[in-house]
Amino acid sequence: MIRSVVRGFGAALPKRVMTNRDMEAIVDTSDEWIVQRTGIRQRYVAGDDETTASLGEAAARAALANGGLTPADIDLVICATSTPDNTFPATSVNIQNRLGMSHGFAFDVQAVCTGFVYAVTTADAYIRGGLAKRVLVIGAETFSRILDWNDRTTCVLFGDGAGAIILEATEGEGTVADRGVLTAHLRSDGSHKEKLYVDGGPSTTGTVGKLRMEGREVFKYAVGMITDVIQAAFDSTGTTADDLDWLVPHQANRRIIDGSAKKLNIDAAKVVITVDLHGNTSAASIPLALATAAGDGRIKKGDLVMLEAMGGGFTWGAVLLRW
């Protein structure tokens, strides 16, 4: 049985760091308020010379170096983003070009904060279907470009960055002991689209628009949706929270992360937290967290790892893999 095994990982962050103290100078907020409600202490903000594609390229090159590969070894590039450099061509094609690739194929996935989970699931399907041997999966965002910096309820939450992994086709035994992606579960419900959205677009306003969010409404649904899809991943593989080595959640809000882990009886020591350092980087948050925890040695070969996210739409999903 073909499995999609993680061959390499990487991350990239903008040069500029904005702390909560910096945010106090922009809007009516405080470090105490932000930390208490979100767990965020700082975030990275892209400069004029940094774009979604440039950050994605840097993360991709880091993943290639980590995996001992070159761009010539990649068959497919998938980039999850809601903040593309252009309406078209796709950011993935831009990154492909930046990497010097003129072979293979590339496309973007847009599922907001769940984008990386969708992208990993898509890459796994291409690998298992025999259409690609190695897939570069990137989550890259510059959410600072779509924030209303006068809206204190949203501008303090988001940051910029990129993360990447390389999935490689590897022969497995077809059991949960295999390395690689074991199962994936994706969901969406468009009836919630007005709770988290951007108030612009090419075919409606002809503008980029700004992010708008009904924070309390999103919070109300988040824990239930996240835990349901994680449980589905456990059930489909015959595993439990006790078997899990690491939960790598979308880094949106510390209270949502803690609430989800508690509901599923997942030990807090097994949860990777980077929201304090990066803020909510949408589709980039999970690969950034993966790169952090794998880079410092916490996530090791053979570990059972759960990825989960929820985003605008609503979209939500989970991927269970063995590192």
Swiss-Prot record:
User: Where can this protein be found?
Assistant: Cytoplasm
Entries under Gene3D superfamilies matching the protein: 3.40.47.10
Q: Which reaction does it catalyse?
A: malonyl-[ACP] + acetyl-CoA + H(+) = 3-oxobutanoyl-[ACP] + CO2 + CoA
User: Which pathway does the record list?
Assistant: Lipid metabolism; fatty acid biosynthesis
Keywords from the named record? Acyltransferase, Cytoplasm, Fatty acid biosynthesis, Fatty acid metabolism, Lipid biosynthesis, Lipid metabolism, Multifunctional enzyme, Transferase
State the EC number(s).
Answer: 2.3.1.180
Q: Using the UniProt annotation, give all residue ranges assigned to the region (ACP-binding).
A: 251-255
A Pfam family name for this chain?
ACP_syn_III_C
Q: Set out the biological process GO terms recorded for this chain's protein.
A: fatty acid biosynthetic process
Write down any Gene Ontology CC term: cytoplasm
Q: Name one GO molecular function term.
A: 3-oxoacyl-[acyl-carrier-protein] synthase activity
Residues at the catalytic site:
C113, H250, N280
Per the record, the domain of life is Bacteria
Q: How does it assemble?
A: Homodimer.
Task: Please state which protein family the record places this protein in.
Answer: Belongs to the thiolase-like superfamily. FabH family.
NCBIfam families, per the entry: fabH, PRK09352.1
State the protein's purpose. Answer: Catalyzes the condensation reaction of fatty acid synthesis by the addition to an acyl acceptor of two carbons from malonyl-ACP. Catalyzes the first condensation reaction which initiates fatty acid synthesis and may therefore play a role in governing the total rate of fatty acid production. Possesses both acetoacetyl-ACP synthase and acetyl transacylase activities. Its substrate specificity determines the biosynthesis of branched-chain and/or straight-chain of fatty acids.
What UniProt notes about the protein's domains is: The last Arg residue of the ACP-binding site is essential for the weak association between ACP/AcpP and FabH.
The molecule here is called Beta-ketoacyl-[acyl-carrier-protein] synthase III
Which source organism does the UniProt entry give? Rhizobium johnstonii (strain DSM 114642 / LMG 32736 / 3841)
User: Gene for this protein?
Assistant: fabH
